[in-house]
A protein has these predicted regions:
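Short loop segments at secondary-structure junctions
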Residues: 21, 28, 118, 141-144
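Short Pro/Gly-enriched beta-strand edge/turn motifs at strand-loop
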Residues: 93-96, 117-123
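Solvent-exposed loop/turn segments at secondary-structure junctions
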Residues: 6-11, 29-32, 94-95, 114, ...
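Alpha-helical scaffolding segments of alpha/beta enzyme cores, especially the outer helices
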Residues: 16-19, 174, 211-214
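Metallo-beta-lactamase
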Residues: 113, 120, 124-211
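Active-site HxH/HxHxD metal-binding segment of metal-dependent hydrolases
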Residues: 1-55, 62-113, 133
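Divalent metal-coordination and catalytic microenvironments
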Residues: 5, 17, 23, 108, ...
Length: 260
């Protein structure tokens, strides 16, 4: 089992293969799966999982299943609930819904090549960047195929607030540009979300970020508030992409990248 990174929607459920399989991922995946300190409160949670933390309607620093119903799925609730007590504390929410992720028993630091079915599979670490610190780019040389997950997506805007709490936008862009060049050696590029493509689709993804950066930076320079920018910023070249309704959240993320 080869992991791109630790996020629940790409890494959950591997335990069914635990009797026979090795689990391969970057060494940083292990730290991502660690539980934050018990002292972590729901009010400490920012960014991607802040909406989950906000479900604490009775303000007891614990999210009961009844508070979560209708807001997150049952399977996602169970993925947050590391201790299985049918409630979510601050540490569980801050860590994310990764309780169903089987940890890797084979890890690497910079790059790794393995053989599956007589064919090479290469994993390359993309260094610490915004989406996660354990991201692997996976390539299949014989198939001329590169796989990139989450930090690049085709035909869809970046997910919601873009994990701005990690504060590593420039590192994210560096990984995108480096991948854009590397992808020119491959016929196919496949992503964790979206259609099959090639290096030109990575260019489209990069240009979106550049346009978003330019628009938000201009709004800041003009003295606009975040709310004004969320109302005013439009990127019509990408209106046909999926997730365009997330643009106001993308603006929020870029605003934090530029001001925090």
């Amino acid at each position: 089992v080869i992991y791109s990174h630790h996020h629940w929607d790409h890494a959950s459920g591997g335990a069914v293969f635990a009797d026979t399989a090795d689990f391969v991922g970057h060494a940083n995946m292990l730290s991502h799966l660690e539980m934050p300190p018990n002292s972590t409160t729901l009010s400490d949670v920012i960014g991607q999982y802040a909406p989950v933390a906000a479900l604490d309607a009775n303000d007891n620093d614990r999210i009961e299943r009844g508070e979560a119903n209708g807001n997150i799925s049952d399977s996602q609730f169970r993925a947050f609930d590391a201790n299985g007590d049918d409630g979510l504390n601050g540490a569980e929410v801050a860590r994310g819904p990764v309780s169903l992720v089987h940890p890797p028993n084979v890890t690497y630091e910079n790059e790794l090549e393995i053989t599956l079915g007589g064919k090479r599979v290469r994993l390359e670490w993309l260094e610490e960047m915004n989406h996660s610190f354990d991201m692997s780019r996976i390539t299949f040389p014989e198939e001329s195929t590169m796989m990139v997950v989450d930090y690049i997506t085709f035909g869809r805007l970046p997910f919601r607030e873009m994990d701005y709490e990690n504060g590593m936008f420039q590192e994210w862009m560096a990984a995108i540009r480096e991948t854009e060049e590397a992808a020119k050696d491959f016929e196919y590029v496949t992503t964790g979300h979206g259609p099959l493509g090639n290096w030109e689709n990575i260019t489209e993804w990069r240009v979106y970020f550049e346009l978003l950066h330019e628009a938000v930076a201009a709004g800041i320079a003009a003295g606009q508030s975040l709310e004004e920018m969320q109302s005013n910023v439009e990127i019509p070249e990408y209106e046909h992409w999926g997730g365009y309704s997330w643009l106001n959240e993308n603006v929020l993320g870029m605003y934090h990248f530029l001001t925090d």
